[in-house]
Each structure stands twice: as C-alpha cells, then as structure tokens.
Amino acid sequence: MAVNEVEAKGLNPGLIVLLVIGGLLLTFLVGNFILYTYAQKNLPPKKKKPISKKKMKRERLKQGVAPPGE
C-alpha cells in the first residue's frame, strides 16, 4: 500500500491531465467512427434532388449532341 502511494505522488499532474484529455478525445473519435459505420450500414441512402429541365438539357448536350459550329 505504501509503495503505491509513493509512485502516485511521483506522477506529474500535467501528465495526468494530458492522459485524461487524450483518453476523452480518443473515446470521442472511436465513438464517432462507430456511429458513422453504423449509419452507413443501416440508414437509407439520401434521396436525390429532382433535376431541373434546364440541367437535363445541358447534360444531354454534353453527352450526345455536338455543340453548333463543330
């Protein structure tokens, strides 16, 4: 019991603070990663927004029809 108390007093308080903050940060990041992977597997994919007629015309011109003058 006495040996443990001597070792505990020898630890730098700054080191303890760094370890606590580092542990919390690591926990936060791991938790976020787990939530992200869970969401990717289980949530339905986002619905695409409807494309306007103007954009559809532009896409059609890009794909098939050559622009005038070429």
From Swiss-Prot:
Disulfide bonds: none annotated. InterPro entries: S1FA_DNA-bd. A motif (Nuclear localization signal) lies at residues 44-49. Residues 44-60 have a biased composition (Basic residues). GO terms for molecular function: DNA binding. Residues 44-70 are annotated as: Disordered. GO terms for cellular component: nucleus. One of its GO terms (biological process) is regulation of DNA-templated transcription. Its main location: nucleus. It is found in: Nucleus. Transmembrane segments: none annotated. Keywords: DNA-binding, Nucleus, Repressor, Transcription, Transcription regulation. DNA-binding protein that specifically recognizes a negative element (S1F) within the RPS1 promoter. Belongs to the S1FA transcription factor family. This is DNA-binding protein S1FA. It comes from Spinacia oleracea. The gene is S1FA.
